[in-house]
Amino acid sequence: MTPATGAPTLRGAAVGRGIGIGLMYGLFKPRVLGAWRVPASGPVILAVNHSHNIDGPMLMGTAPRPVHFLIKKEAFVGPLDPFLRGIGQLKVDRTTVDRTAITHALGVLGDGGVLGIFPEGTRGEGDFASLRAGLAYFAVRSGAPIVPVAVLGSTERRGRLISALPPLRSRVDVVFGEAFDAGDGSGRRTRKALDEATVRVQGRLTGHLEQARRLTGRTE
């Protein structure tokens, strides 16, 4: 992050990507499909299903570009606070309209970076069944395309050594989908327009998840 503003930096996210690669490929066996669908340059939003704590680190280690994730403020405790900030991650208060987080997230996209979002707002079934409007807002406001991402296999079994993690060296599938625009081309940013965009986005995300399950043979 930049000392003056606290904004995340690409350099920090690049360090985070290196750590993610080392950890995820060292502990598990990620199988990455469709990573070429992530634009090689320019702003993009990765919309990731979220059913396990490793989903964020897994994306940091498997995405083809450094990612700045919006992460709940509760994760920024003790030494994790400066660490997460240092690797370019964004702290967000989910209980209110966090204008600092919004500004930093739009700044990432404005600088042509990659913003990672868990559109359900919290960890759950990971099925995109309940989306918050934040994803559509960032996409419509910035004009950045959305790339849906399905992380599958992280909750199928529990590890013997660490029950909170999948078994060591187990396969986790990460499937990137086709990029798409959230807006309808009208340029509207009204609440109604965002609600309509959220419905469209949800349809694309659930469709990608179903396709990813068929492709990988996963049922979770």
Question: Which functions belong to the PLM regions below?
Answer:
Residues 2-12, 100-220:
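Non-catalytic C-terminal accessory region of glycerolipid acyltransferases
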Residues 16-18, 25-26, 38-96, 104:
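Catalytic core of membrane glycerolipid acyltransferases/transacylases, capturing the structured
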Residues 25-33, 155-159:
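Short gly/ser/thr-rich secondary-structure transition/capping motifs
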Residues 28, 95-99, 128:
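A conditional alpha-helix N-cap/helix-loop micro-motif detector
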Residues 34, 71-72, 88, 118-119, ...:
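A secondary-structure boundary/capping signal
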Residues 36, 73, 93, 150, ...:
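Residues at the C-termini of beta-strands that transition into short coil/loop
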Residues 36-39, 167:
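A short beta-turn/loop motif at secondary-structure boundaries
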